[in-house]
Amino acid sequence: MSGKAYFVNGEHGPAIIEGPLTALNWLTILPVPSATAFDRVTGGRVMASVPFIGIVLGIVGGAIAFAATSLGVASIVAATVIVCFWELFTRFMHLDGLADVSDALGSYAPPARAREIIADPATGLIGMGACLISILIHISSFTALLDAHLWWMVMITPMIGRFCAIFGAHSRLKPMNPTGFGAMLIGTVKTHTIIAWLCVLLVICIGVPLAMDRGELITITILGLLCSVTLALVEIRHLHRRFEGMNGDTTGFIMHSATALCALVFAVGVGIVA
């Protein structure tokens, strides 16, 4: 995700429109109009809208899961289609961040060299291994959830993962590089934005199970949220210290790993309850 855009002056539109549309343009394959200005205002609006992208992914993934369950499609096939769709829809952007950061962490190199590894377009063995592990966790966990006819838990997973990503751009964090894509994003998310989205996620984690008449699973959805946020905070602390800053790739790393953990917690929790 890093190094793909540079600061450009321009005019801004209404935040409530510009933020989500630009997020869709930057982070998905949808050809929607985006902001003409490339600055930290735009970056902040995009990061504040990242959980909205999670909602879009969740709704589409949930629709695929529901249709597959209704039609009797094998759970592993449906789970694979959902994960592949998400990766294609987001241009593998976050998977790329997972690979780049994993390679840098696995190198045990000094911060300056680690940042060079992140910027290197080539992917090493550690990065490929991390991607494989994450994808396998996604598919196996979703298979278990679909076997239990809990398609709506698949829907919630990317919402939680995208929410966790915005912690990695909190105003207390600094970018690795003062220019480029990461500098537009890192340090732009305010605490009140995180709190607002946390309230939305809590409503989803409580309201959806109740709407599906599965109130006994609220504990699991809340636990998935808490575990994912905890993982994100631990990762942010380590990454910020390890690389002496954050960038777009670290955001993708946090997002992908938090989503994988959420899916795993959901699947294990449902298995225990069952």
UniProtKB/Swiss-Prot annotation:
Keyword Cell membrane applies: yes
TM helices/strands, residue ranges: 46-66, 69-89, 117-137, 151-173, 192-212, 216-236, 253-273
Signal sequence segment: none
Assigned keywords, A-Z: Cell membrane, Cobalamin biosynthesis, Magnesium, Membrane, Transferase, Transmembrane, Transmembrane helix
Pathway of action: Cofactor biosynthesis; adenosylcobalamin biosynthesis; adenosylcobalamin from cob(II)yrinate a,c-diamide: step 7/7
One GO CC term on file: plasma membrane
A GO MF term: adenosylcobinamide-GDP ribazoletransferase activity
GO biological process: cobalamin biosynthetic process
Subcellular compartments: Cell membrane
Disulfide feature: none
E.C. code: 2.7.8.26
Family: Belongs to the CobS family.
Function: Joins adenosylcobinamide-GDP and alpha-ribazole to generate adenosylcobalamin (Ado-cobalamin). Also synthesizes adenosylcobalamin 5'-phosphate from adenosylcobinamide-GDP and alpha-ribazole 5'-phosphate.
NCBIfam families to which the protein is assigned, alphabetical: PRK00235.2-4
Protein name: Adenosylcobinamide-GDP ribazoletransferase
Species per Swiss-Prot/TrEMBL record: Corynebacterium diphtheriae (strain ATCC 700971 / NCTC 13129 / Biotype gravis)
Top-level taxonomy: Bacteria, Bacillati, Actinomycetota, Actinomycetes, Mycobacteriales
This protein's encoding gene: cobS
